[in-house]
UniProtKB/Swiss-Prot annotation:
Cofactor requirements of the protein: Mn(2+); Co(2+); Mg(2+)
Cofactor binding: number and manner: Binds 2 divalent metal cations. Shows activity with Mn(2+), Co(2+) and Mg(2+) but shows no activity with Zn(2+).
Family, as annotated: Belongs to the HDDC2 family.
Catalytic activity entry: a 2'-deoxyribonucleoside 5'-phosphate + H2O = a 2'-deoxyribonucleoside + phosphate
Protein name per the record: 5'-deoxynucleotidase HDDC2
Organism classification: Eukaryota, Metazoa, Chordata, Craniata, Vertebrata
Organism field: Danio rerio
Length: 200
């Protein structure tokens, strides 16, 4: 049980790891990695598509960023190559799952690897949820700051990455709400005429 306690303490670290993208954009009280994964898991829970395994989607959402309790949230702006990022996270996952009994160790590590390699329909869907959760959060920060459009780069970065019908439906609702806020102008700190909404 000592190892299980250490595992749970590592999981708890995710509550204290801020999402780097928000830190770099000077967001006050940025969300943690744990915050992000919780809403992703709730998104997975609400998926109604019977062609995918909902339980597996939830598990993938819960473990996909687990390595960040050790390596931190490595953002594109950190200029770390994909190969190096994967190496660091793989080493972290070997350590983290090594605290668990063999069955759990294999299950959690294999879930992480499945997400990393995008080797299943569930992993591909959860990747879409990952991107969608990010831009929902970006929209919420724009609302909280009263600066519609300030975090446009996050929306641009997801263009062409959404395909699942349920994800597209939620994206449509998000785009419509955000368009209204941009039209209203907020504090007009951004040239909203040049903005585009997130694209499928």
């Amino acid at each position: 049980m000592d190892n299980m306690l250490q595992f749970m303490k590592l999981v708890g670290q995710l509550k204290r790891v801020p999402r780097t993208g928000w830190v770099y954009r000077n967001i006050k009280q940025p969300e943690s990695v744990s915050d992000h994964m919780y809403r992703m898991s709730m998104m997975a829970l609400t998926i109604q598509d019977i062609s995918v395994n909902k339980e597996r989607c939830m598990k993938l959402a819960l473990v996909h960023d687990l390595a960040e309790c050790i390596v931190g949230d490595i953002a594109p702006a950190d200029n770390v190559s994909k190969a190096e990022k994967h190496r660091r996270e793989k080493d972290a996952m070997v350590h983290i799952t090594g605290l668990l009994d063999d069955g759990l160790r294999k299950e959690i590590y294999n879930l992480w690897e499945e997400y990393e390699t995008q080797s299943s329909p569930e992993a591909k869907l959860v990747k879409e949820l990952d991107n969608l959760e990010m831009i929902i959060q970006a929209h919420e920060y724009e609302e909280l700051e009263g600066k519609p459009g300030r975090l446009q780069e996050f929306f641009v970065s997801t263009e062409g990455k959404f395909h699942h019908p349920e994800v597209l439906g939620l994206l449509k609702s998000l785009n419509e709400e955000r368009a209204r806020h941009i039209a209203a102008g907020g504090e007009k700190t951004t040239d909203t005429d040049s903005l585009t909404l997130a694209k499928p």
